Amino acid sequence: MTVDVLVARSDELDLASNTSDTTINATVVKDETIITRPPPTLTRSWSLPNASTRRTDNPAPPVLTRASSLPVKLVEPATDIDSDSSSVWTWAWSDEMQGPATSKRCGTRWIARLLPFFMLMLVGYATYDVVVYCCVEYFIQEIRKTATAIVLIVFYTIFFILMVAAYIRCYVTIQFNTGFVPWTAAREAAESERNERSTNGGDVESLQWSPADTNPDSPGLEAFYSKDVFICESDGLPKWCSECRSWKPDRAHHSSEYGRCVYKMDHVCPWMGGIISETSFNFFIQFTFYCACYCVLIVSTNAYVVTLRRNAGQSVEGRVVVGLALGSLFGLFSIAMTVTALRFVFQNITNVDLFRKNQTFRLAVRVPTGTRSTDQFTTITYPLSPPGDDSRAPGTAHSNGVDQSDGAGSIATNRMAARDQRAKRTFAILQTQSGENPWHVGYRNNFKSVMGETIFEWFLPLRHSPCTRHDSMVSDYEFGPLVEELKRRYGLAEEDAEKGANETTSS
C-alpha cells in the first residue's frame, strides 16, 4: 500500500505548524523503498526568508505532518538548503493532465474537432473578401485609392494576428491546462474500477456517488484549514464532491460534461473546444475582443465598398453581400460575448454564479482559539478529533495509525501532538445574505485579478490570470470587504478587538 508522507525540518516548524502541506520534499513510501517523487508539472510555490537565520549545527529530527491513517515511515528530506539562498516550498496542487482534455459526450467531442476547421474556412473567406477583392481589386486597381487600401490591409493584419494568437493560446490552454482539480488516490482507483467494469460490461453508475470523507486526516482537508477563510458547509467542513471523491476548493464546480471539478468554471465553449475556466478566461476575453474588432473591420470595409458602388451606379457583387452578412453575424455575437465576459470580470463572477445570483455562501472565518459558538454562529476547531473520540484533550493528536508500542512511533505521535497543539485553529461559520459576493474586491482589483497587472497583459495573451496562483496564506481567492462586514454583523469584530486588548494588557 502506498501513502504520501509530507515531512519538514523542526527548525521550520513555525510555518509547517500552520501549513503542513507545504514541504521541502515529498516522498512515497512503498514496500520499505523510498522513492523521491519528481516535481509536478504545475505548482503553486512561494519563497521563505533566508533560512540561514534559522539553521542550527545540530538540526532536530524531522517532524511528521498529518497525511493519512496508514503506518508511515519518517524520511529526512534529501534536499539541503544553502545558507545564502531562500528555500522554496511547493504546495502540491498540480494539474496532472497528460493529454488533451476530452468531453464524455461524443457529440461535444466531434463539434470541438470540427469547429476549428469551420472557423479556418470563415477566416480564409474573410481574407479573400477584404484583402484580395476589396483592397487590391477594387480600391487599388479599379478606383485608385491606394492609401485607403494600405491602411485597411495594415489594420486587417494586426487584428488578424492578435485574434489568431489569442485563439491558439486559449485553445491550447483549454486542452492541456484545463483547470481541473487534481484527483485524489481514491478517485483514481474508482476511475480505474469504473473503466474495468465498463470494459467487462458491468454497472458503472454504482460508482458515481461517494459520501463525504469522515477521516480527520482526510487527504486535502488540511489545505483548507491552513487558510484563514474558506467556503464551507453548515457543519464547517469544506464542500465535498461525491463524484470526484474530494474536497472542493473555493469557487470550484463539477462539470458533468467532463466528469471533473474545475477551478472557477465559467462555461463549456464548443468554439474553443472545451471548458472556459480560470486558466483560460483572460485569453477567451482577448479572443472575443479581437474577433469583434476583426468583424467590425470586415463589415466597415464591405459597407464602404457597397456605398461607393451604389453611388457610382454599379451593381453590388454577391461576395460583398456574403462578407457583409457573415461579418455582421459573427461581429454581433463577438461583441455580445465580450461585453458579457467583461461584466463578469468587473463583478468578479462567472457564468455559474450568474445562474445562482440569489445563492448564499457559508464562510469559515478564522477566529481566536477558544471562541465558542453563540446563538448567531457556530464554531469548529481543526484538526478534527477522530469519530467517537470525545475523551481526547483539545488540540491533542491521535495516533494517526502509528503503533504506540514502537519507540519511533511514540516519538512521532508526540511530535504530532505538539504540532497539533500549535496548529489548532478555530473557525466561525458565517453566512452571507442572498446575492452577496464575498469575492468582490472593487472593480479595478476584480479586473486585475483576471486580466493581469500591466496593460501588456490586458491586450496580449502572455500570462495566466493572477487569480490562478492560489499562493496566499489567507484564502484561495482574495476575499473582499464583505468578510470584515460579516465579522461586524455577527459581533466578531468587537470580540477580536477585546481579546487583542486583553493580550496586550497581560503582556
UniProtKB/Swiss-Prot annotation:
The gene is PFA5. It catalyses: L-cysteinyl-[protein] + hexadecanoyl-CoA = S-hexadecanoyl-L-cysteinyl-[protein] + CoA. InterPro entries: Palmitoyltrfase_DHHC (IPR001594), PFA4/ZDH16/20/ERF2-like (IPR039859). Its EC number is 2.3.1.225. The DHHC domain is required for palmitoyltransferase activity. Keywords: Acyltransferase, Lipoprotein, Membrane, Palmitate, Transferase, Transmembrane, Transmembrane helix. The chain crosses the membrane at residues 114-134, 148-168, 279-299, 320-340. This is Palmitoyltransferase PFA5. Residues 239-289 form the DHHC domain. It is found in: Membrane. The keyword S-adenosyl-L-methionine does not apply. Residues 41-60, 192-212, 378-410 are annotated as: Disordered. It is an enzyme of class 2 (transferase). It comes from Gibberella zeae (strain ATCC MYA-4620 / CBS 123657 / FGSC 9075 / NRRL 31084 / PH-1). GO terms for molecular function: protein-cysteine S-palmitoyltransferase activity. It comes from the Eukaryota. Autopalmitoylated. GO terms for cellular component: membrane. It is a multi-pass membrane protein. The keyword Membrane applies. Belongs to the DHHC palmitoyltransferase family. PFA5 subfamily.
